[in-house]
Design a protein with these regions (language model features):
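Hydrophobic, membrane-inserted alpha-helices
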Residues: 27-34, 54-58, 76-85, 100-107, ...
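C-terminal ends of transmembrane helices
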Residues: 8-11, 56-68, 104-115, 186-197, ...
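Structural signature of hydrophobic alpha-helical transmembrane segments
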Residues: 40-52, 90-99, 169, 173-183, ...
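N-terminal signal-anchor module of multipass membrane proteins
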Residues: 2-62, 316, 324-327
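A generic, well-ordered mixed alpha/beta core segment in the N-terminal half of proteins
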Residues: 79-144
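Long hydrophobic alpha-helical segments that form multi-pass transmembrane helix bundles
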Residues: 115-188
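Loop-to-transmembrane alpha-helix initiation sites
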Residues: 118-122, 235-244, 265, 283-296
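Cytoplasmic-side transmembrane-helix entry/capping segments in multi-pass membrane proteins
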Residues: 69-79, 96-99, 116-126, 201-210, ...
């Protein structure tokens, strides 16, 4: 560079490209490998068909609203992959395709882009399927792992949980969604979130803490001998059952929907955990995790307006008064 020639300006405020959805798709691939080990080739077929259909639906939706189609952000892959893994391995091919169509055309497309949609597309798709065909969405019966999932057995009373049952819940040899049963894999993905997205891990941590407190309270209310070994096992099994760990990894951390500030992240995560616990008590569905996500998405703007906005205004008034007193 010659003397007198100015250095090119560097835009320090250039927006960093988000790696959230590509990273989450990597996590889905890990779950796909685990579910293939347990359920066979049918899981890969369902996963592939679901992902391809989500990409095609997203492309059509972008054409309809004349929006630029971006497959590289991996959001469509995330929608298709997660919906398929939340369904049973025996689900018919059309079921995840229908869920993807609802998620893309009725949740994502009307709002123009993933950054403007007020609801989780995946949660909306699975919730829609749960309402329309609960017999297929929660049909977890299999010759290898039995007919009753952990969530169903816990809802029917206080079961006797043996050490073998606890081990099965950790390694994933229990009835459930194709990619939702292996607690070891989910815990590994939580550490992955911690490494790649430490701010999002705050969401996961406080959501799980809320669910853990809820599991303790429910177990204490249902059992006479709370400090018995069976009670401790029930608490651990509750944490591994249903969509609990899936929500901690994929839903409560979803960047476009999560608040940015730490305090609001904590409040948002605790809110989702509380709603999830309440719905687990009153809902007729085997797992109401997706409805908990949607309700939290719906009520979060209300919390922003009536809880955080007044606090912010009060702080601004206080700072102005302090500045005036100094002058």
């Amino acid at each position: 560079m010659e003397r007198g020639e100015q250095m090119p300006k560097v835009n320090k405020h250039k927006k960093k490209k988000s790696t959230y959805y590509p990273d989450m798709c990597f996590g889905l691939c890990i779950l796909l490998i685990v579910s293939f080990f347990f359920h066979g080739i049918n899981v890969i077929v369902n996963f592939s068909v679901s992902v391809i259909s989500a990409i095609l639906f997203d492309y059509v939706g972008c054409k309809i609203i004349k929006h630029k189609f971006r497959v590289k952000n991996c959001h469509a892959v995330f929608i298709g992959g997660l919906i398929s893994l939340m369904l049973p391995a025996s689900a018919p091919l059309w079921l995840p395709v229908l869920g993807c169509a609802f998620a893309v055309f009725l949740v994502k497309t009307p709002f123009g882009s993933l950054n403007h949609a007020p609801f989780s597309s995946v949660s909306a798709g699975v919730a829609f399927l749960s309402i329309c065909r609960p017999d297929l969405v929660f049909d977890y019966a299999s010759a290898e792992f039995g007919t009753v999932s952990i969530a169903r057995s816990l809802s029917q009373g206080t079961p006797v949980v043996t050490a073998v049952d606890l081990i099965n819940a950790f390694i994933g040899t229990v009835p459930g969604g194709a990619g939702m049963t292996c607690a070891v894999a989910m815990i590994g993905l939580l550490f992955f979130v911690l490494l790649r997205h430490p701010k999002s891990f705050i969401n996961s941590l406080f959501f799980l803490l809320t669910c853990f407190v809820g599991a303790i309270v429910l177990t204490a209310a249902e059992t006479d001998k709370f400090f018995a070994l069976n009670s401790m096992r029930i608490i651990l099994v509750r944490m591994c059952s249903g969509y609990t760990l899936c929500m901690a990894v994929f839903f409560v951390t979803e960047e476009p929907l999560s608040p940015k500030k730490k305090g609001r992240r904590i409040f948002y995560s605790v809110m989702m955990g509380v709603v999830y616990i309440i719905l687990g008590l009153v809902s007729e569905f085997e797992d109401a995790g997706c409805f908990a996500v949607l309700l939290t998405n719906a009520f979060w703007p209300v919390a922003e307006k009536y809880i955080f906005a007044p606090v912010r205004s009060k702080k601004e008034v206080t700072s102005v008064e302090s500045a005036e007193s100094l002058t």
